[in-house]
Amino acid sequence: MTHEEILAMLGDYVDYLIANSSAEAPMWNIEKVRSGKPNKWNYIDGCMITACLSLYKTTGDEKYLRFSKNFIDWFVQEDGSIKTYDPKEYNLDNVNQGKNLFTLYDIFGDEKYRKAIETIRSQLATQPRTKEGNFWHKDIYPWQVWLDGTYMAQPFYMEYETRFNKMQGCIDSYKQFMNIKKHMRDEKTGLYYHGYDESRQMYWADPVTGCSPN
């Protein structure tokens, strides 16, 4: 199979996904669809809409932009509230989808996206933290730092701080990354452990390092 044939096949697959997906029933999260449970604002959709917006930027094909906008608009209300999203859950996973709001705001200039950005930023303003200052991964996971939580929250955090807050939170973000390096990096391999429990109370936490087994 040639490079061109592979690209064509991938393009057909993506087109099939978006043609058969909606915010209420995204085909890429088929387990959720089959469960019969209503879809919620979540990080999986965030990853896929980021991919669709990247395809729009790369190809210029409006179908990717239309799909992304329609998907996000199902959740984002005119007042900036986000259907099914509660900032007080303090779940870093839910921040990930917020990255797409910056792109849609840049393209369309609709203030509801700007307001929704503030809605998500309000979560980080009061997100519980470890004693050293890192965001808890979730309120239901106290004192825990997870690598994927860093991916979920920090890009949005830095985008916001750079655009709208005169970079005031950049040092805070840097310190959080340095704490991760300090506690979660294996000096022998250079690889990182997935989780860290500052309290050492979780069953998986090493009693000395606080890190997960892997």
Predicted regions and their residues:
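Extracytoplasmic mature domains of secreted/periplasmic and thylakoid-lumen proteins
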Residues: 80, 87, 92-152
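Extended ligand-binding clefts on enzyme/binding-domain cores
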Residues: 147-214
